[in-house]
Amino acid sequence: MLFLLASEVVLAKKPWIIDPHTHFKGEEQIAYEATTKEWHPDNSLGKVVKPEDYRAVADRLELRSTLVVEACDQDKPEYNDWVLRQVKESDLLCGYIARADLKGTEFLIHHRRYQRTGFLNGYRFRFDELNDYLNDPLARQHLAILERQGLVIDLLIEASHADDVVSLSRDFPRLKIVINHCFRAKIIDGDISDELKRAIKKCAAQKNVFCKMSSINNFSEVAPFTDPAPTDLNYYLPVLDSVYDAFGANRLIFATNWGVSAHFGSVDNVKDVVMAYLKPKGQKVVDSVMFRNAMTFYNIKRKYLR
């Protein structure tokens, strides 16, 4: 009994939040992108970012582990391989959402290689890529494979893509789908657009669609690398209330989007705002949104948590 109690005390002190949205890049990728892109000097996407750079943030915010999300071009599978190596080597990382071209004939070659690592949790599509895949026979074959394998599709999209989300959900009803950053919501003059409100309700009606309550700073009207985003919970209620009322506590997933969210203010604010919103709803809701939903939805293995 004493041993069990001691174990529980140790466990209680561990970081407890799962952060299923961060970005990391290695030297080779940054050197390549320096020849193809022009980043703001303070943009984290233009810098080498490794797991140890995240450790202080994770410890401070009680983030137990992070699921990394792609930040690379479709035709650079070697950058997926780099991230997967980081996941294997770092106790902070518990999985990866990769980048790929589902219309490509070599998709399955790379997919099988990623799977063999044991750290692949799914793929992310960006904007109009989703519509392209829905209209491509080979991509649809690959989507059916991902559905059978229980993998997740992350979507970096906006409200204008809502119909495509519905089509994906209905055509592949067992596919696990998650909308990133509340459709990249923007609060203008204290509210969100009617188009966004409709998109949230339309997509939430599909039961295999989840939503990340993530990157809260980016919802503000401030420009990146200028003044910090507001810290008052009330400012963010137009977004938070809309997604909570539509998706409910069991289909929302917290995430920081570090370090992009830091372009608009402190990453601490992302957690603080979401926690301030969830706490009055009870500990069960807090636990669901802050870690349980991510663990279940992404099939994160506990043995990979620090």
Where are these regions (language model features)?
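Bacterial N-terminal signal peptides
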Residues: 1-8
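Mid-to-C-terminal alpha-helical segments outside catalytic/metal-binding sites
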Residues: 9-20, 29-31, 35-61, 65, ...
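Divalent metal-dependent hydrolysis catalytic cores, especially in the metallo-beta-lactamase
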Residues: 37-74, 93-100, 121-128, 151-153
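Alpha-helical scaffolding within the catalytic cores
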Residues: 46-55, 78-82, 106-110, 162-165, ...
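Conserved, mostly hydrophobic/aromatic
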Residues: 21, 83, 96, 146, ...
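Active-site gating/metal-coordination segments in enzymes
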Residues: 74-160, 167-169, 183-184
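Catalytic pocket-lining loop regions of alpha/beta-barrel enzymes
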Residues: 133-253
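Short, well-ordered coil/turn segments that N-cap beta-strands
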Residues: 14-16, 62-67, 90-95, 117-121, ...
